[in-house]
Design a protein with these regions (language model features):
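Structural alpha/beta core scaffold segments of enzyme domains
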Residues: 2-337
Length: 337
């Protein structure tokens, strides 16, 4: 082991700024106003951006594009981003966050998947025709009632799994580089690139990030920047674990927006606390399984009802629950499902 591997946080560019994100810190609320004036006036702050400063699409999402880049009307979970700051140091950026004033009108909270389906449950996304239901996945095979009639024994149980943190070793880190960046303007080079014989000059907006889906990152960043995908480059650095937790956008778009706004490289590194707060988790589930079997061990029928808690935004929920539903019988041949 040489210890020479470089992850996103190991890259340093001349003239680089450091970014932080102002989170909602309330689970469900309408935004009445956002005041960033004091943060903008703090010495060492180079940019403070809100939803009004996004030149392109103010939303991202791998499957459903429903997650705001920066919230301007409403927040739907405590980790929602409302404003981003780029400053000379991470400490100055953090101090600027404390100066951003947000006036919220807090709303009722829905905290689990079953409660979310109640007729009087608060709607997280008012524009969705099915309320809080993202997708209803149906699997049908054979005749379940005939299968249970042929069973000698029926087991009917409800199982629950909790929300699970992926807990990768490396917290999220993104570095945005503006198009036409020239490091010599700041009197230096990027050592990590020089070691590979690469120039630190960039002809398009570039994002360095440890990501599981870099091409999706490119397309979503381009949409937010209001440019074509071929005008954005994503460099997938080595990744200190992901396990599904680095599929969604976290700091990639924010770093790119700040880089273009300041015309300087911008690094956004999450603390462990922020990482735990922000990224999507493995779904909490409630699973009712009714299984029929004969005394000689043959499964005659399975009836499964699964509820998955996708949280505030779709992420990969419909894919995860499609997999869970189609695998509900496990590795067994069951004629009636």
């Amino acid at each position: 082991i040489k210890g020479t591997a470089r992850f996103a946080d190991d890259y340093h560019f001349p003239g680089m700024l450091y970014a932080r994100t102002r989170r909602a810190h309330v689970p469900h609320a309408r935004i009445r106003s956002i005041d960033t004036q004091a943060a903008r006036e703090l010495p060492g702050v180079h940019a403070v951006l809100t939803h009004e400063d996004i030149p392109g699409r103010n939303a991202h999402g791998i499957v459903s594009v429903d997650w705001p880049v920066l919230c301007g009307r409403k927040v739907r979970y405590v980790g929602d981003a409302v404003a981003i700051v780029a400053a000379d140091s991470a400490e100055i950026a953090a101090a600027a966050l404390e100066l951003i004033e947000i006036d919220f009108d807090e709303l009722p909270v829905v905290s689990n998947a079953i409660a979310a389906l109640e007729p009087d449950a608060p709607h997280v996304h008012e524009e969705r025709p099915d309320g809080n239901l993202l997708k209803h996945i149906k699997v049908r095979k054979g005749d379940v009632e005939d299968g249970f009639a042929a069973a000698d024994v029926i087991v009917d149980q409800t199982y629950r799994t909790p929300t699970t943190e992926h807990l990768f070793l490396e917290p999220e880190c993104s570095i945005g580089i503006p198009a036409a960046y020239d490091p010599t303007r700041f009197g230096g080079i990027c050592d990590a690139l020089a070691e590979r014989g690469e120039t630190a000059r960039h002809d398009k907006t570039t994002i360095y990030v440890g990501s599981q889906i870099p091409y999706a990152d490119r397309d979503q960043a381009a949409a937010a920047l209001g440019v074509e995908p071929d005008e954005v480059r994503v460099v997938a650095t080595l990744m200190g674990g992901g396990f599904g937790g680095k599929e969604d956008i976290t700091g990639q778009i924010h770093a790119a927006l700040l880089a273009e706004a300041t015309q300087r490289p911008v690094k956004m590194l999450y603390s462990r606390q922020e990482s735990l707060l922000v990224h999507s988790k493995r779904h909490a589930t409630v699973i009712r399984m009714r299984t029929g079997a004969t005394r000689d061990g043959k499964l005659t029928a399975v009836q499964a009802i699964l509820y998955g808690d996708g949280g505030a935004y779709a992420s990969l929920s419909d894919k995860v629950l499609t997999r869970a539903t189609t695998h509900a019988t496990g590795p067994y041949e069951v004629a009636n499902v």
